[in-house]
Amino acid sequence: MESPEKFTNSKEVIAFLAETFPKCFSIEGEARPLKIGIFQDLAERLEEDERVSKTLLRSTLRHYTNSWRYLYSIKEGANRVDLDGVEGDAIEKEHADHAKQQLDESKAKAAEKRKAKLAQQPKRKDKRQFNRPKGEKSANSDHADTKRGTKPKNNRPNTTPPAKLTDSDLQQGTQVTVKLGKAPMPAVITEVAKDGIHVQLDSGMVVKVNADALRLARSKRS
């Protein structure tokens, strides 16, 4: 009998844990604070499962508990849960403060990375518009005007371009638009994670995108 294929990354293990222990782990929505010592419980319950090693399990737990979604759940007085969802000790203020500090630091680092990435992107300029005397048209433009017999008109209404999201906008419930095809689609932020932003479209589908792909919905702007 062949051995089952082993998991190779944390994402696969988290999906497995959410399926095996749904009252403890989740991959979307609000996370639940984990019982202190949950690793030992997992190691014992999964001892016979050859698909996940203790090393990968440990790194997966670290990845899960460092996510923004999980850090949001660490509030003073909230109860931790075991693998079966049974509530246990309440979270102390010290632990809640530490989680908030981790969350703030992680958000700051993510903002710096986005800022650095934007700074590295070259400004797109239309070189054809440079060094052309004011009022002079290109040969192609003259030919097109002659052929049509009329001057080209821009019938598009003057609209304000959609606003980019600020750090304060990156939170659950923010109305946004996301460009998945030719036209932007309305969506709502459901989760803000280090590896991307989860948004839910009007169709109900949830997708993960980069913050750069999002714009603030017009209804949210003043």
Curated annotation (Swiss-Prot):
The keyword Electron transport does not apply. Residues 94-171 are annotated as: Disordered. Residues 114-131 have a biased composition (Basic residues). Residues 155-164 have a biased composition (Low complexity). GO terms for biological process: post-transcriptional regulation of gene expression. GO terms for cellular component: cytosol. SMART domains: ProQ. Keywords: Chaperone, Cytoplasm, RNA-binding. This is RNA chaperone ProQ. It comes from Alteromonas mediterranea (strain DSM 17117 / CIP 110805 / LMG 28347 / Deep ecotype).
